[in-house]
Amino acid sequence: DYKQLEYEMHLLHNEYIGELRLGASTTIAQYVLPPLLGNFIAKFPQVNLSLINGNSRGVETALQEHRIDLGLVEGIFRLPNLKYTSFLQDELVAVVHAHTKLDIQDEITPEDLPNIPLVLRERGSGTLDVFERALSQHNLKLSSLNVMMYLGSTESIKLFLEHTDCMGIVSIRSVHKELVAGNLRVIEIKGMPMQREFNFVQLQGQEGGLSQVFMRFAGHHSKSL
């Protein structure tokens, strides 16, 4: 289409100049964006790129307050004055440390969850939103679970698991290295899938410009992420 042709012509002449302020949820900022940002800066050296990170609700607030131009969030809730565009698929998994003293099988049921000590992401995080929604499919609530701690980042959860006998709920993208190294193991929660989407988020009516350039660039590179 015309926009795609225009995008490719600008690419050819490397004509993109200006400032692009990104905001991304913690999981996306830590585990998805770094290689993408590096490639983008190499391709568009005249674009002044900046990134802030926080949980998904915080990113949406920053967008509404015009502190950023484009957000990337992982939640399932939608605000009516924002436009959401799908970017990547993700999945949450339950993990324990490889040397945990928890008496836990490799496969459990949702009904087992109230008996297992948990460490979870904080309120306002997309990760907790998705976990709560999955619980509700089995008539379970957070208040019925044994939550030891709510922490502000996945890295904090992984460190907590090293020193505490409990189970964490995190993005599969965040634990790839630990699973390969054998430091963590996945516990399957039977019949409780926790798929989600990472989404771009923009103010309604403010689409275009460098935000659109970044979204197109990310779309072209999404298969390698």
Predicted segments, located by residue:
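Alpha-helical linker/hinge and terminal dimerization helices associated
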Residues: D1-H13
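Flexible hinge/capping segments at coil-to-helix
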Residues: H13, L82-V119, R123, Q212
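Central regulatory/effector-binding core of bacterial HTH transcription factors
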Residues: H13-P80
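Short, well-ordered beta-strand segments
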Residues: E19-G23, G71, V95, V119, ...
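A late-sequence structural motif
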Residues: V32, I187-L225
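Hydrophobic hinge/microswitch elements
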Residues: N55-E60, Q64-I68, V73-E74, S136, ...
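Short beta-strand->loop
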Residues: K83-V93, N146, L179-M194
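Secondary-structure junction motif
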Residues: P117-N139, G208-G209, L225
